[in-house]
Amino acid sequence: MRLNTLSPAAGAKHAPKRVGRGMGSGLGKTAGRGHKGQKSRSGGGVRPGFEGGQMPLKIRLPKFGFTSRRAMVTAEVRVLELAKVNGDVIDLNALKDANVITRNIQFAKIVLSGTIERPVTVKGLKVTKGARAAIEAAGGKIEE
């Protein structure tokens, strides 16, 4: 068996409806588009969010908040992911080398999710209260 020889079972897939191919098909002539109007034309239709000229909901509602640019380069690392890191010292570069976080990440925060068995030293990363307790319970320590 090869990937290029795989195919669905006979009768498992329906043929797509062929529109505009004669009156006997039931979808001839106007091809299910009705008569005239913008939506019947080639390329016809309106963009998503267009409300026919009425002031759109997006503009009627007030603006709020902002998008933090720091959040784009900050990652949350779960405690159980620390096991993927080789060595006892865990810092930003160690997380990148272990492919726990991507290369563009500049800040990381360790959150409590899962458990850790071996003692590790966390350097230069933010740590939540729960994660701190879990790391210290395993015999590890946190250095700022």
UniProtKB/Swiss-Prot annotation:
Pfam families for the chain: Ribosomal_L27A
GO cellular component: cytosolic large ribosomal subunit
Keywords (A to Z) from UniProt: Ribonucleoprotein, Ribosomal protein, RNA-binding, rRNA-binding
Gene Ontology molecular function: any one: structural constituent of ribosome
Chain spans, region Disordered: 1-54
Biased composition annotated in UniProt, kind: Gly residues: 21-31, 42-52
Keyword Metal-binding assigned: no
Summary of the function given for this chain in its UniProt record: Binds to the 23S rRNA.
Protein name: Large ribosomal subunit protein uL15
Organism of origin: Shewanella oneidensis (strain ATCC 700550 / JCM 31522 / CIP 106686 / LMG 19005 / NCIMB 14063 / MR-1)
